[in-house]
Amino acid sequence: FIIDGESVFQLNTEYYSAIVKNGGIPLGVFSSDYCIQNNNSNFLSDESISDLDNILSKCNGILMTGGYNWNKCDEYILEYALKNDIPILGICLGMQIMGSMDFFNSDMPDRTIRNDTIINHFQKGKQYVHKCKILDGLLYKILKKNSIVVNSRHNYHIEDRKYFNIDAYSEDGLIEAISIENHKFALGVQWHPESMIDYDEDMFKIFKAFIEASIQS
């Protein structure tokens, strides 16, 4: 964010708590260019890439958090994690980045699509908003359930890009979870499990599986 002309970085404490409660140690990763250029999302210098490589080489797992937009730094972090088989958990915007970036295809797809369905998917403060149908995939392996109920606070969604697996749908047909094959652990969820771990065991299991995969990497 830009506040009074200065770049400010924020991280919801729920992400921090979810990682710590499962035995992980959080480490924030961002590029110096992002600070210097005041949110110029199209710039990533060689020096910044070198700094990112140095930091990311020390990471056992990558949590792509929610937010309002993404930049070249986010794309580079995800690309690094995919190429180096580092466990990934993408949440809300983090899942949308995973689902909109095909690093192995030169044709870049459209990013996201604004929601226009029967369910209001942006409901802050609600513990539960809608059901999700879980398909065979990584999410099912973690939860061993065919459906769950989740919170929801997103205005955009992704479409099927063929290079990822669809792990869950909402009742109105939006993609709610994805995974990437041939990767140690790469799961994206459209809802916010970090906000639910204190009252929903399934959300705790998602973070537990992510941290365990990270410890083993």
Predicted regions, residues:
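N-terminal beta1-alpha1 cap of cysteine-dependent amidohydrolase-like domains
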Residues: 1-93, 100, 114-147, 153-155, ...
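Post-Walker A helix-loop "phosphate-sensing" segment adjacent to the P-loop in P-loop NTPases
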Residues: 102-110
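Active-site-proximal beta-strand elements of phosphoester/diester hydrolases
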Residues: 187-191
